Amino acid sequence: MFEQQPEDLRFYVKQLASVAVQKSEPSAWFEVLYTEAKGDTAKIPWAKLAPHPYLQDWLTNHQPFASRQKALVIGCGLGDDAEALAYRGFEVTAFDISPTAIAWCQERFPDSTVSYVVADLLAIPSQWHQAFDKVFECRNIQALPLNVRSSVISSVAAVVAPGGTLLLITRVRDTEAEPDGPPWPLSESELKQFENVGLQQVEKLVFLESELDVKQVRIEYQRHT
Ligand SMILES: C[S@@+](CC[C@H](N)C(=O)[O-])C[C@H]1O[C@@H](n2cnc3c(N)ncnc32)[C@H](O)[C@@H]1O
């Protein structure tokens, strides 16, 4: 999130997020940002218009079995990661809390097989409970403040089917102290919560982006049958 963004956009996002957090509506500012962008992707700090490179790398190196496998993309933004999974053969549902983001995905990919829906990660539909073979979570948890972190992690884990996997891409921080977000990178103890809610870590890669002073991880978790 916010990689190499102009200072004024970064400042604007921080302001929007700060007001939303003060009102205890931490997800409310995303719709404002998408609406105000008026179709200009340069105004969406995380929009790369391509799948995340660590997802691409995972798909290339793991060659996952995708036929009739149901995938869920959390906080799908403008849809590039969802499209990459669909291209590999997954039956993809992708959701975001922002109706404007979802409409934007449908406009960008009119022939897509992805089912794009508006939904709230903190109030997921009951039929999604443990329903997905592959869950992709990229840079959404870090975009929400620490006071909702446990609930967010529980919700992300809750949609993983028995035998299914979660692929997580996120920034991490080295201390337990509260960072000045957004983004709010995850701590070691927060990552541990995935295991406390029934998942087991299968693979973890750490990426240091020293020019940005950013540490990211890509972790694959599995829910045992
Ligand atoms: C930092 S962006 C990341 C988007 C995308 N995952 C990526 O990596 O490009 C966070 C996304 O999460 C969405 N979001 C925020 N709160 C949410 C919630 N409670 N439920 C679902 N989506 C949410 C936002 O609208 C936004 O598209």
Mark where each language-model region is:
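Class I (Rossmann-like) S-adenosyl-L-methionine-dependent methyltransferase catalytic domain
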Residues: 1-72, 77-128, 144-159, 163-225
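Conserved acidic residues
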Residues: 133
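A conserved beta-strand element that flanks and buttresses the S-adenosyl-L-methionine
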Residues: 136
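Short catalytic micro-motifs in class I SAM-dependent methyltransferases
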Residues: 139, 143
